């Protein structure tokens, strides 16, 4: 665990207690060419560096979890390079992905993945430790999620971790007592058959009052027109992010394509960071 980075992250967060951070699902493979220094992640490094006051929680996911090899960094030089570069920034927490599959993944499988994420800290060639666990596809099964989170905290021991629970929708308030961050909305901007993002209406409906600093909003496919006909341009992006900041929502992320693109405009990773700074 990169303790100096944690201290820096805490300092940055305290210095801007009402700041809205970036919760980035970094589902982009780190490299375009083997061992190229994780060039595919360079836009993230640039955005993090350009906005040191913005806290980041960056979710990494080699293969629906810590990877197939069972080894730290998934025994992949490109992930080792990318994660070690993320860990060099004091305003970044690197978070490991696990899939709960709506509480149908076996607890043994979940615990195995959590343990493998912890073991990334044993790699001696670079700092690739993760600072927390991202529980994807969380659902309303308190005992299941509480057991997984309790195991995660015990596994990481004296190293404090961040637990992120991705409900993607309204979650009962009790989950805010066990999850450090609850994703209360995840959907596209205005896709047919999917929940629409409606700015303040969505925030008020999906986040229990008083829990805004522990909540996150993620909007993908920010393109075309919004629910009210507004064009998904840089101005609307700034408006939506400013509303989240004004409401003291703890975390946000918008992207104009899927999670496999961080440079498609207008909601590039750099623009999101700039608007939240």
Task: Say what each PLM segment does.
Residues 17-277:
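Glycan-processing catalytic domains of CAZymes
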Residues 1-19:
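Fungal secretory targeting signals
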């Amino acid at each position: 665990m990169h303790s100096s980075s944690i201290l820096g992250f805490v300092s940055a967060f305290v210095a801007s207690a009402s700041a809205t951070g970036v919760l980035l699902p970094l589902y982009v493979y780190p490299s375009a060419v083997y061992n190229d220094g994780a060039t595919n992640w360079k836009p993230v490094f640039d955005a993090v560096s350009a906005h040191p006051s913005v806290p980041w929680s960056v979710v990494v996911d080699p293969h629906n979890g810590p990877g197939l090899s069972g080894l730290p960094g998934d025994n992949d030089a490109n992930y080792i390079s990318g994660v070690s570069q993320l860990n060099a920034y004091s305003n970044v927490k690197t978070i490991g992905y696990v899939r709960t599959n709506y509480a149908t993944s076996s607890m043994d499988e979940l615990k195995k993945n959590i343990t493998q994420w912890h073991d990334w800290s044993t790699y001696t060639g670079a700092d690739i430790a993760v600072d927390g666990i991202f529980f994807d596809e969380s659902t309303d099964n308190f005992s299941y999620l509480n057991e997984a989170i309790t195991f995660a905290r015990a596994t990481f021991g004296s190293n404090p971790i961040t637990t992120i629970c991705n409900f993607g929708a309204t979650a009962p308030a009790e989950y805010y007592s066990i999850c450090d961050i609850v994703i209360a909305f995840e959907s596209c901007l205005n896709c047919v058959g999917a929940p629409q993002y409606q700015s303040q209406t969505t925030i008020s409906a999906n986040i229990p009052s008083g829990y805004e600093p522990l909540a996150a909003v993620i909007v993908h496919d920010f393109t075309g027109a919004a629910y009210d006909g507004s064009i998904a341009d840089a101005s609307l992006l700034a408006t939506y992010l400013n509303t989240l900041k004004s409401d003291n929502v703890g975390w946000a992320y918008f992207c104009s394509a899927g999670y496999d693109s961080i440079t498609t405009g207008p909601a590039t990773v750099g623009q999101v960071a700039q608007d939240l700074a």
